[in-house]
Amino acid sequence: MKKLSRKIRMLTQLFLLRLASQVLPGPTGKYLARRFITPQAAERSKAASALNASSGVRTETLTLAGINITTYQWGDPSREPYVLLAHGWSSYALRFAEWIPMLRSMGYAVVGFDQPAHGASSGKTNHLPLFVEMIQQVGRHFGKPAVFIGHSMGASAVVFAQDEEWCPERFVLIAPFVAISENATRQFETAGISPKAFTSFEAYLYSVTGRRFAEYEGALRLPLMKGPALIIHDRNDRETPWEKGARFAKLWPGARLFTTEGLGHNRLLDHPSVINEVMNFIKPETINGQVD
């Protein structure tokens, strides 16, 4: 009965949003923009539980841009080649917890961090420009990583985070998107929201971030990317269609696409086939020999 009541409530809310986007597109767009930059709070409790279940991890708080960022370290990134982990939207660093023993056994130190408004870090909102800035600042704090592993928005953001001063040697990017504008438009279309609300939606985001969607068009940056890259995407990804990942891989010079079936957007992070593919791609002898 609870599930039925919840479903009826969600359908009613969706109907009202669709109607409001037609009648009051300005306020509706602004409301949707606020939701767009607010991660799901429920994931914070999952992050806390994951930390309680973790062993051998060292936590540290960095204050970056006035935000307290929680970092997680295994090994010594100042002495060992390290892997930098970047989680996706409404997720947390310890989502990669199952990967840590294998990464450590290969001789890597590992660094993860919770984005603002995610996991144990402070803040209430986040957005792609801030994702990019945090990857840059955390990366520069710990130095050049031997490997960058990112999921979803964490994977897409690194395209704009790396520059001449800071660039990982090798990339593993799971379920990335090419353009944030495409994701936003797709969400509008899937929910049946009137396009008339999109103008105020983007205007509100600009007032918060000072950036336009057009500034984060991956198709312009991807052809300039350097370093071996493994792109992983599932054909049944409902959040970011497989075609986006395939295009991402095609635009990145020399990138390799690994496709999974039936794992969706999130479950592929836990699947042995994905983890094994990544470990083979980043094993030290592969990197030292630059074998793709």
Model-based region annotation:
Residues 163-211:
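Hydrolase active-site cap/lid region
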Residues 224-226, 231-233, 237:
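Short beta-strand/loop motif that positions the catalytic acidic residue
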Residues 93, 100-122:
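Conserved alpha/beta-hydrolase
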Residues 149-158:
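Gly/Ala-rich beta-loop-alpha elbow adjacent to hydrolase catalytic centers
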Residues 3-61:
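An N-terminal hydrophobic leader/cap segment in hydrolases
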Residues 125-146:
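Alpha/beta-hydrolase active-site loop
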Residues 263-273:
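Catalytic histidine-centered segment of alpha/beta-hydrolase-like enzymes
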